[in-house]
Every structure is written in C-alpha cells, then in structure tokens.
C-alpha cells in the first residue's frame, strides 16, 4: 500500500511538489521542455541567485543542463575553432577541462596554482602564461577558475577574485567560473563569493565581461550525482553569441526533467518560515559538518606522516598532499622505467589496496625543476 503523502511529508513540501508539477508540460516528468529548461524552474534559480548575490538575475540567462559537464562541453564547442584556440586552465586541474579541450580540438594553456601560498592564483603567472601562448600563435579565448578548488580545496579571497575579473576584462577573455562546491566552505576565515557578484560589484554591465557560471546537483551537500542536474548562467554575451549558445543547447532538445527540478531546489531550498525547514537545515548542517570533520582529519593525518606536507582544507571535498620521495625510491622507479609518482601510486596500491592518482594525472609539476626527481604529489 502506498501511504498518503500528507502522512509523511510536510504541508509546504506537498505544496511545492504541486507547484512544480503545474510548471511542467503535461504535469509529468516524461515530456520535453524548452531547450533552456522549464521557465518556472529557471525563475526559481534566478531568484536563488539574486538572493545569494544581492544583484538581479534573469531566467533567460540560465540554461539547465545534465550536470555541469555538458555546460562545459557546450562552451568549449562554442569557443574552440581549431588547435590555435586556447583555454587557460588551473593546474592542478580537474581533468574535465583538459579532456573537453582535447575533444573539441583546442589547446590547453596551463597556469599553475601556488602551493606555497595555499594554492593561490597569481595574476602575474596567469599573465605570463597568456603572453607565452600568444607568442606561439595561440588565440587564448577564455580563463577557467574553479572556486572552491578541485582538486586543491582552496577558497579564493575576494580581493583575488576582483583581480581575476579585471584581468579577464583587460585581456578580452571569457571567464568560465566553476562554482559547484560553493556550499562547501570549512575555513572560518573564508567565504564564497560568486564571480557574478564580483562582476556586478565592480559596476560592470551586461556587455562588459562575458561570464559563464556553473552549478551542479552532484556536489555541495546534496550529492545527487546520478540524477544529472545543473545549470550554467551566461551573462555579458552579445545577442548573436547568445543565439549560437541556444542553437547548440537545442541540439540535445532539453536536459532531463528530474535534474531540472533538483537544480531548482538546490538554488531555492525551504525558507525559515516553512514547516520542512528544520529537518532540511538539520540534514544540510549535518552533512557539511561531517565533510568538514573528515577533511580536517585527513589534513591532520597527512601532517603527521614523514615526507608529506599538505595545505589546510578550506573548501570543496579535496586535499592535495605533496610527497617527498627518498632517493632510493627515485632509483627504483627509474629501474622500473616508471615516473616516480606513478611508481609510488602502484606500490601503494599493491601494499595497501588504496587507489590514488599520481600528481601528474592532474597536470601537477614539482616545485622546481631542480627538485623534479625528488618531489611529487598524489
């Protein structure tokens, strides 16, 4: 027997479900929607963005997607014409970006996060990499920023974000802001600020800086990875470019309706006045507190291990420790014809059953070329 919904759900939850169903064509999740997503759900997301940032948001700027990844692929398809088009990507990097750039035939232009300053983004280094790429005939078209960081777990300082936005404005770059871990902040002295908020705080208007912001229901405290929901918010693009974005989105007809609903709920959760708010807040706070405890436990554990250093956990779901291998391990790796970090990762797997990815898998380089034979990351 199926229980009466009113016996197990709060009144506001039932009311919300009915409101959402009324927005969907055919009042069911099996029909196609508008290619950008159901208008009422985009309205809810726009309202959530406005509430978060303190600046208006427009439902027409929002494209609902099957997770953040399809939005990334869409923009790479739009931005990359041939191998001479480049995208600036942070290293260590989330492999989605290198794979998507390669898939669409472009060139990855790396900029290296500074491990010694807590994985800081140094504008001077980004500019150096940009100028070097341009000197090689690469037309650099966009800058990717992941905040909070994946796989490094840092949270950008607000001042650093202002510098990044100004840099993109001055250099004519599209800013691709991966903000899927915006709820995961563990450091007391850190706070998430969206790049949309930073852009508007600088007084930039709709046509001043092309910005694409990504959000996903796979991350944060919700973790609905298999539901495949998310969105991208596009601002600062001209009408002809927006038309092309819409055309590409229309090729896939629409994202799945269940994911669209979840994306709207993530950005428009229960309010304090709702009956369901107490249980919602308790579950959310419990999950985030658990993630914070585990991040801290790993940070402390790494700091106690010989030959390992690790920056503090600030956000996202990651730590990126550095391992200083002894000379005998370097020699053993060479004898086995393997890179030291890959050799270490395989030995760790064989000895403990623990699976790790060598630092080189994230594009990571050692602190200096002199120490390249001694230092690695996992």
Where do the model's predicted regions map?
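PLP-dependent class I/II
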Residues: 1-36, 40-378
């Amino acid at each position: 027997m199926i229980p009466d919904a009113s016996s197990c759900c709060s009144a506001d939850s039932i009311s919300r479900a009915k409101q959402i169903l009324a927005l969907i064509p055919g009042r069911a999740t099996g029909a196609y929607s508008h290619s950008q997503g159901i208008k009422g759900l985009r309205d809810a997301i726009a309202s959530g963005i406005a509430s978060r940032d303190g600046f208006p948001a427009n439902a027409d700027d929002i494209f609902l997607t099957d997770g953040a990844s399809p939005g990334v692929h869409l923009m790479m398809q739009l931005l990359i014409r041939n191998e001479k088009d480049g995208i600036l990507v942070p290293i260590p990097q989330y492999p989605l970006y290198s794979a998507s750039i390669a898939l669409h035939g472009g060139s990855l232009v790396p900029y290296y996060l500074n491990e010694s300053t807590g994985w800081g983004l140094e504008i001077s280094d980004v500019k150096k990499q940009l100028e070097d790429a341009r000197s090689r005939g690469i037309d650099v078209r966009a800058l990717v920023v992941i905040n909070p960081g994946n796989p490094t777990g840092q949270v950008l300082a607000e001042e650093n974000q202002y510098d990044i936005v100004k840099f993109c404005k001055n250099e004519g770059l599209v800013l691709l802001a991966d903000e899927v871990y915006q709820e995961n902040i563990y450091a007391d002295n850190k706070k998430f600020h969206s790049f949309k908020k930073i852009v508007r705080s600088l007084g930039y208007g709709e046509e001043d800086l092309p910005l694409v912001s990504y959000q996903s229901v796979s991350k944060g405290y919700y973790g609905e990875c298999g539901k495949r929901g998310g969105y991208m918010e596009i601002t600062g693009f001209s009408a002809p470019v927006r038309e092309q974005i819409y055309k590409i989105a229309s090729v896939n007809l629409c994202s799945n309706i269940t994911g669209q609903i979840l994306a709207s709920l993530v950005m428009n959760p229960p309010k304090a006045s709702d009956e369901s708010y107490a249980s919602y807040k308790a579950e959310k706070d419990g999950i985030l507190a658990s993630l914070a405890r585990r991040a801290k436990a790993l940070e402390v554990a790494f700091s106690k291990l010989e030959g390992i250093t690790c920056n503090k956990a600030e956000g996202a779901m990651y730590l990126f420790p550095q391992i200083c291998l002894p000379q005998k391990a370097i020699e053993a790796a060479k004898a086995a014809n393997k890179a030291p970090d890959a050799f270490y990762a395989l030995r760790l797997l064989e000895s403990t059953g623990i699976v790790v990815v060598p630092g080189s898998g994230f594009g990571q380089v050692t602190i200096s070329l002199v120490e390249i034979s001694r230092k690695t990351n996992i």
